[in-house]
Amino acid sequence: MATNYIFVTGGVVSSLGKGIAAASLAAILEARGLNVTIMKLDPYINVDPGTMSPTQHGEVFVTQDGAETDLDLGHYERFIRTKMTKRNNFTTGKIYSEVLRKERRGDYLGATIQVIPHITNEIKDRVIAGAQGHDVVIVEVGGTVGDIESLPFLEALRQLAVQVGREHTLFMHLTLVPYIPTAGEVKTKPTQHSVKELLSIGIQPDVLICRSDRMIPPNERAKIALFCNVAERAVISLKDVNSIYQIPALLKSQGLDDFVCERFRLTCPEADLTEWEQVLYKQANPVGEVTIGMVGKYTELPDAYKSVNEALKHAGLTNRLSVNIKYIDSQDVETKGVEVLKGVDGILVPGGFGYRGVEGKIRTAQYARENKIPYLGICLGMQIALIEYARNVAGLTKANSSEFDKDCEQPVVALITEWQDAEGNTEVRTDESDLGGTMRLGAQQCHLVSGSRARELYGKETIEERHRHRYEVNNTLLPQIEKAGLKVTGLSADKKLVEIIEVPNHPWFVACQFHPEFTSTPRDGHPLFAGFVKAAYENHKKSVK
């Protein structure tokens, strides 16, 4: 079967939800038995989002093979079974870097390097490479049509549609159809102008996804179809919903998957959305609720912790609970004290970088440990828990991380200078290494200690989880901390790096160096998050007695 391409663009304004729409369509097509993958093309000049501020760009999603990617890839993995790789996300910066590298190497035989054909050819080559082995590949272009940054991507996709044949390509355009209260009606003009912008660069959309706060009336859909030269059945109304997991059913109810399959002449069974119906049922019928306090430094933008937020919701589905997330700035713990932590049923300290707010996180870990509140530490959250235990239990009063104090006397957390990647290759890092692309990244094996809470939760001895860090537990000082009672319950494949720690004589205190949120899905959840939310609910029931 030839590979079929769906190109997804956005118009009028940004943040319409192209990624969610693309992932939802992929979920329906997958439910019809098709092998689907999704790619994200980002117009910014950064090589990847690895060094971008989380408060500007949101979280960095890490793939199995260690690529630092856009948060939309997290949505893709939560909606479909296909795992993303470094082939599923690339930026303008990465494209230009590769073209310039080839030019220096002499690959272009002295040609004058230009956007067309060299940049566009590189884009096309990467899209085709990422599509190998799949029935359908959905390609999302970041940004908004009309932005100068996205023009090379749009031109490349226009050319690709000609090369592979229009019978194997479909352009899907998301637009805003705003409702004007004073007029009492939705307005289609922004959509018409957005399509006109696409037409000016040679792209005629085949499907229009119309975003609004309500369903688009049939007469307005007919109007959009007429003036935008699109089949009326291909004008899809995508209203605001309470849960993003309602969107696959909403798109299917309007026949989008049927239209796509007919366009590509694919013969496949009807989509079975039973799993998604179960997700929605659990979401709509919780038997209780819990409040989780998330203590971090990027709390002004919840998207900075997107996968953690979703993983907590998934754990709620697993336990039939509604999970409320209370975002707490770790600096508030420093300035206002632990009073800001009162009233939460469980405490989660996610990953992060830099010294700002660290002492507040350490006080948070101490509060959770001493008051028997369920605690889940992730990446930095584990290092924080270790520092707190070293200072207040093990007698290492000057314990710290060399990330925060290079000259600290008791660096219980220090820079990893050498480690093995998932393929067994040795990676080396020094203080002079670049910040970008030099961390321990991607899926790594972890061995769980028999009898530990982690082993009980996972139900197996060896697991594989994704990492993104450059600091680790210092094994030189670890024996003194273990002697004071801290349990190391997870170790790397070579048994050299600490992956999981647990505090004994506590209802639930588990911290991990890896990022379990990256592998949590609404259909399957994740054992660590499920166990944490369950423990938080037990704590909640005690507090309301």
UniProtKB/Swiss-Prot annotation:
Q: Name one GO biological process term.
A: pyrimidine nucleobase biosynthetic process
The segment annotated Amidoligase domain runs over 1-266
What superkingdom heads the lineage?
Bacteria
The protein depicted here goes by the name CTP synthase
Q: Which reaction(s) does its UniProt entry say it catalyses?
A: UTP + L-glutamine + ATP + H2O = CTP + L-glutamate + ADP + phosphate + 2 H(+); L-glutamine + H2O = L-glutamate + NH4(+); UTP + NH4(+) + ATP = CTP + ADP + phosphate + 2 H(+)
**PROSITE patterns from the entry?**
GATASE_TYPE_1
Native species of this protein? Haemophilus influenzae (strain PittGG)
Task: Please give the family membership noted in the entry.
Answer: Belongs to the CTP synthase family.
Quaternary organization = Homotetramer.
Glutamine amidotransferase type-1 domain location is 291-542
Chain's role: Catalyzes the ATP-dependent amination of UTP to CTP with either L-glutamine or ammonia as the source of nitrogen. Regulates intracellular CTP levels through interactions with the four ribonucleotide triphosphates.
GO CC terms: cytosol
Q: Write down the top EC class of this protein.
A: ligase
Q: How is its activity regulated?
A: Allosterically activated by GTP, when glutamine is the substrate; GTP has no effect on the reaction when ammonia is the substrate. The allosteric effector GTP functions by stabilizing the protein conformation that binds the tetrahedral intermediate(s) formed during glutamine hydrolysis. Inhibited by the product CTP, via allosteric rather than competitive inhibition.
- InterPro entries associated with the record: Class_I_gatase-like (IPR029062), CTP_synthase (IPR004468), CTP_synthase_N (IPR017456), GATASE (IPR017926), GATase1_CTP_Synthase (IPR033828), P-loop_NTPase (IPR027417)
Identify the metabolic or biological route this protein is part of.
Answer: Pyrimidine metabolism; CTP biosynthesis via de novo pathway; CTP from UDP: step 2/2
* Positions of CTP binding: S14, D147, I148, E149, K187, T188, K189, P190, T191, Q192, K223
User: Which positions does UniProt annotate for ATP binding?
Assistant: S15, L16, G17, K18, G19, I20, D72, K239, D240, V241
Annotated binding of L-glutamine, by residue: G352, L380, G381, M382, Q383, E403, R470
Q: Which UniProt keywords apply?
A: ATP-binding, Glutamine amidotransferase, Ligase, Magnesium, Metal-binding, Nucleotide-binding, Pyrimidine biosynthesis
Q: Which HAMAP family match?
A: PyrG (MF_01227)
General remark: CTPSs have evolved a hybrid strategy for distinguishing between UTP and CTP. The overlapping regions of the product feedback inhibitory and substrate sites recognize a common feature in both compounds, the triphosphate moiety. To differentiate isosteric substrate and product pyrimidine rings, an additional pocket far from the expected kinase/ligase catalytic site, specifically recognizes the cytosine and ribose portions of the product inhibitor.
Where does the chain bind Mg(2+)?
D72, E140
Which of this chain's residues are annotated to bind UTP? Answer: S14, K187, T188, K189, P190, T191, Q192, K223
Gene Ontology molecular function terms on file: ATP binding; CTP synthase activity; glutaminase activity; identical protein binding; metal ion binding
Signal peptide residues are none
Catalytic activity, EC: 6.3.4.2
